[in-house]
């Protein structure tokens, strides 16, 4: 689903979602208006509409869904998005940084395509590229620094979560490979090399990373003109996942893939808890039809791991798929209606 229009009931063009959010002892009302073909409108505490990104951080959630398999088996973009989504939760100002980076990247790519079409790099192209390089390096350095920080926060919890969901015979690890250190193609070929290359970047400041990105852009300029696209930067980096030192992509079994994907989400949950450990500040865990994909042992292990969460929402097509330990307040959804268990049609 690429737009929120799919959330609208068939035959309608508008929907309102209202929520009262209590985090620690602070209550906030949030209203989201979804209108077909238009930008979403958001109100906080019934004030004037604000940008949708302004509600980031008000409701912290961690979603487990069948689509999470793409975090392990899919293209590098899925893993980059995982890091960026968590980064925005932990550092909301990074939403604007990422938006700036994407905008500059589009402009720079358009200029490179223009140079390729001209068959040469003119003086005007050179001067304009120098300007875009500075902007791209500045925003890219902040994105990269944030990703490395987030990876440091989830690496330990990832290993612990995978051990808790399995027999613990394989160590789950995550490594970052940056294009400002070596080339990585978007087809994910770098995944056959399990080790990351970010060690030299871990202690680098944003300004130092900016200089390294600038140097990489300069070194690649002729190649970029020939291909009409930006070849280095956070948009081309890769998060490599390994099990027992072996790349998970292409080598992990279906069960291992599921366990690793779930472990990534559990690691992000743990990172949020550590970021704000106040009572009542924990993120909401949403398990969207994941138990149907797990065997009995993994169901029991996952249920045990999430049992201590402050709030857990579970969806399932078959109630028997949900472990008894997670059955609290049960709601049944029928076409056009939601009923408490024991009420409504079929009660």
Segments predicted by a language model, with ranges:
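Structural recognition of the conserved hydrophobic beta-strand(s) that form the central parallel beta-sheet
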Residues: 19, 311-317
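Hydrophobic/aromatic beta-strand patches that form the interior of the parallel beta-sheet core
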Residues: 62, 313, 329-331
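Walker B catalytic acidic pair
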Residues: 288-290
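Hydrophobic positions in the central parallel beta-sheet of the AAA+
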Residues: 62-64, 283-286
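Nucleotide-state sensing region of NTPase/ATPase domains
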Residues: 1-78, 82-94, 152-160, 209, ...
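Conserved NTPase motor "head" modules and their coupling/switch loops across ABC/AAA+ ATPases, GTPases
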Residues: 120-284, 293-297, 301-304, 308-309, ...
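Long, non-coiled-coil amphipathic alpha-helical linker/lever segments
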Residues: 3-4, 83, 90-147, 284
């Amino acid at each position: 689903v690429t737009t929120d229009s799919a959330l609208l009931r068939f035959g309608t063009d508008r929907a309102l979602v209202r929520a009262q959010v209590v985090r620690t002892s602070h209550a906030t009302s949030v209203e989201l208006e979804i209108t077909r073909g238009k930008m979403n409108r958001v109100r906080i505490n019934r004030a004037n509409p604000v940008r949708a990104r302004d509600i980031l951080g008000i409701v912290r959630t961690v979603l487990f869904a069948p689509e999470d398999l793409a975090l392990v088996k899919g293209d590098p973009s899925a893993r980059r998005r995982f890091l960026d989504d968590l980064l925005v939760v932990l550092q909301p100002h990074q939403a604007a940084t990422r938006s700036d980076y994407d905008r500059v990247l589009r402009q720079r790519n358009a200029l490179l395509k223009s140079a390729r079409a001209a068959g040469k790099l003119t003086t005007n192209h050179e001067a304009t590229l120098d300007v875009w390089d500075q902007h791209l390096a500045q925003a890219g350095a902040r994105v990269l620094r944030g990703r490395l920080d987030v990876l440091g926060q989830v690496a330990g919890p990832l290993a612990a979560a995978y051990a808790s969901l399995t027999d613990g015979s394989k160590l789950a690890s995550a490594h970052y490979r940056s294009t400002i250190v070596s080339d990585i193609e978007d087809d994910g070929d770098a995944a056959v090399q399990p080790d990351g290359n970010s060690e030299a970047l871990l202690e680098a400041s944003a300004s130092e990373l900016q200089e390294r990105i600038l140097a990489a852009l300069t070194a690649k300029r002729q190649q970029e003109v020939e291909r009409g696209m930006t070849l280095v930067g956070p948009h081309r980096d890769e998060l490599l996942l390994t099990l027992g030192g072996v790349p998970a992509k292409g080598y992990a079994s279906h069960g291992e893939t599921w366990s690793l994907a779930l472990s990534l989400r559990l690691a992000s949950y743990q990172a949020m808890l550590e970021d704000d450990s106040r009572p009542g500040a924990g993120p909401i865990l949403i398990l969207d039809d994941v138990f149907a994909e797990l065997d009995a042992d993994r169901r029991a292990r996952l249920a045990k791991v999430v049992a201590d969460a402050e709030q857990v929402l579970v969806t399932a097509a078959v109630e028997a798929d949900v472990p008894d330990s997670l059955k609290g307040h049960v709601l049944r959804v029928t076409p056009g209606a939601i009923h408490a268990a024991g009420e409504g049609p079929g009660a």
